[in-house]
């Protein structure tokens, strides 16, 4: 179950990409279980589940920078997952968010800060991580070189539009994705 929104600080957010792949965003909360059972995947479009946040969307887009809502979103996933992968855009947030998850209903999680300032694992270099399991925090690093992956540069990861991001995703799903 993926919980997300449209792009705010990038050219394509998870909702934009999934919409481009043909996933409907206007799914009513009561239909999510059926979709999950049918497809083994469901996308929870944040504005459908948190109507009061709709008012801040235009302000966030106008600001064009990360805000508290980037951190809050994964923490208020209405599916209340017990396992989660959470990316943060600043290294000092890894431990803070890991501790927050440790004190919640989460049983197992990874909080990641990717090389290059990304809120996800990247092939740019080592990813700082904190694993939460059975109430314990374990710091670790994930280096692409350890898996035979040569680091790339940020330009190789960049997409400049929603349509480009969707094309890249389609190629990845077809087994023809880019190196980075």
How should each PLM-predicted stretch be described?
Residues 1-26:
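Substrate-binding N-lobe of the ribokinase-like
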Residues 19-26, 31-180:
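Glycine-rich anion-binding loops and their surrounding alpha/beta cores
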């Amino acid at each position: 179950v993926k919980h997300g929104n449209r792009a705010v600080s990038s050219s394509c957010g998870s909702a934009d990409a999934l919409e481009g792949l043909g996933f409907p965003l206007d799914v009513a909360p009561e239909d999510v279980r059926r979709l999950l059972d049918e497809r083994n995947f469901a996308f929870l479009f944040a504005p459908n589940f948190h109507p009061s946040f709709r008012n801040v969307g235009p302000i966030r887009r106008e600001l064009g920078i990360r805000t508290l809502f980037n951190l809050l979103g994964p923490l208020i996933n209405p599916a209340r997952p017990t396992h989660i992968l959470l990316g943060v855009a600043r290294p000092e947030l890894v431990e803070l968010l890991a501790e927050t998850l440790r004190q919640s209903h989460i049983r197992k999680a990874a909080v990641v800060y990717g090389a290059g300032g990304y809120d996800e694992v990247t092939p740019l270099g080592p990813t700082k991580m904190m694993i939460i399991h059975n109430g314990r925090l374990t710091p670790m690093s994930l280096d692409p070189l350890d898996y035979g992956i040569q680091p790339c540069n940020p330009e190789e990861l960049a997409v400049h539009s929603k349509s480009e991001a969707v094309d890249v995703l389609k190629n990845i799903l077809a087994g023809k994705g880019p190196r980075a």
